[in-house]
């Protein structure tokens, strides 16, 4: 049995402007929705003695950027849940993996409203949004992401995290090093 959790919503803008309700909506979909679906399948997977759960997170789980803090917080929460669940469920032959793409052009970009230029932040959130949309729109080949999801779902020895970046992004070197350092340090404690 395989469950792939890929639902997500994203709001861009200053935290104080987006407000608590917006942050709660992001957590409801990105974290609690995934959590609920996952909890529905775990008993059946455990009963069958195997299973695979793949959570599509985001590089934003580790690389929070301005005007994206709420989204990053939800993806960080999902990454932590993914790693913890993988450790809990491994004895039952159930693996839980995360696939963390970096800014690909998906429907999440189409469903994200441009922030307002009104208020104390002026045009900064709008400029940031336009830059983000431009980068994402140039990355429409999702095959690296779907390949990572397929590997996470079917590889007998999957990685806990699949970091997926289009081409070569220097930031991924920093990202890979940070994740590896954190994992190595954790194993030593």
Each PLM stretch: what is its role?
Residues 14-15, 22-24:
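Substrate-binding pocket helix/loop in short-chain dehydrogenase/reductase
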Residues 38, 74-77:
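Active-site helix of classical SDR
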Residues 4, 37-41, 55, 81-82:
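Hydrophobic positions on the long internal alpha-helix
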Residues 18, 64-72, 84:
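Active-site loop-to-helix junction immediately N-terminal to the catalytic Tyr of the SDR YXXXK motif
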């Amino acid at each position: 049995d395989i469950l792939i959790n890929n639902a997500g919503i994203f709001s861009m803008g200053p935290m104080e402007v987006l407000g608590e309700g917006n942050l709660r909506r992001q957590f409801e979909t990105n974290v609690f929705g995934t959590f609920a679906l996952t909890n529905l399948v775990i008993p059946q997977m455990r009963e069958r003695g195997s299973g695979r759960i793949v959570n599509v997170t985001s590089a934003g789980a580790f690389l929070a950027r301005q005007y994206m803090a709420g989204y990053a917080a939800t993806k960080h929460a999902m990454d932590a849940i993914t790693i913890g669940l993988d450790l809990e469920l491994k004895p039952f032959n159930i693996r839980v993996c995360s696939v963390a793409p970096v800014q690909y052009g998906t429907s999440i970009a189409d469903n994200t409203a441009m922030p307002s230029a009104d208020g104390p932040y002026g045009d900064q959130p709008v400029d940031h949004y336009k830059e983000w949309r431009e980068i994402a729109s140039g990355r429409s080949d999702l095959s690296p992401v779907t390949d990572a999801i397929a590997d996470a779902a079917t590889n007998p020895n999957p990685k806990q995290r699949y970091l997926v970046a289009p081409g070569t992004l220097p930031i991924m070197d920093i990202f890979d090093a940070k994740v590896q350092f954190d994992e190595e340090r954790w194993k030593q404690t």
